[in-house]
């Protein structure tokens, strides 16, 4: 995907995004790709070299990466931070990186996925977006 800067954001934003390449590890498909439309996933894979995205449209993603980096440094006892897990479903290796797992004495764990978003998103989705719920459910399936 080609990165543009049509809105003239400061160069460090562009440099960060150019260096910040997502990896799904050894997985054939990531949880975040799986919760998206299959058609969108296929088209993004097929036309990745032709697609363009402006760095201004990635501001929440950039802020999210910064928040994740900060929270990664605060690993408390009985927690696992930013662990990538894999599981096979239907002959495909699915991978996902869980932001925080809190381990409980009874052997269970609580999964947390941090989100940075706008106030409007929360105003119109007080329970969270459906894809966020789907993402956590897939993480839970992989973590089992």
Where are these regions (language model features)?
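An active-site-proximal "capping" alpha-helix that borders the catalytic cofactor pocket
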Residues: 132-143
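Metal-dependent nuclease catalytic cores that hydrolyze phosphodiester bonds in DNA/RNA
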Residues: 1-111, 118-134
């Amino acid at each position: 995907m080609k990165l543009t800067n049509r809105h003239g954001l400061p160069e460090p934003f562009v440099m960060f995004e150019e260096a910040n390449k997502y990896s799904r590890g050894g997985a054939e498909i990531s949880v975040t790709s799986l919760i998206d439309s299959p058609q969108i996933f296929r088209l993004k894979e097929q036309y990745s070299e032709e697609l363009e995205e402006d760095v201004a449209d990635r501001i929440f993603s950039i802020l999210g990466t910064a928040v994740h980096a900060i929270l990664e440094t605060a690993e408390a006892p009985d927690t696992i931070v930013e662990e990538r897990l894999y599981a096979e479903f239907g002959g495909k290796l699915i991978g996902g990186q869980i932001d925080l797992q809190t381990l409980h004495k009874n052997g269970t764990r609580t999964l947390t996925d941090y989100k940075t978003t706008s106030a409007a998103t929360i105003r119109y989705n007080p329970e969270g977006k459906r894809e966020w719920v789907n993402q956590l459910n897939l993480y839970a399936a992989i973590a089992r």
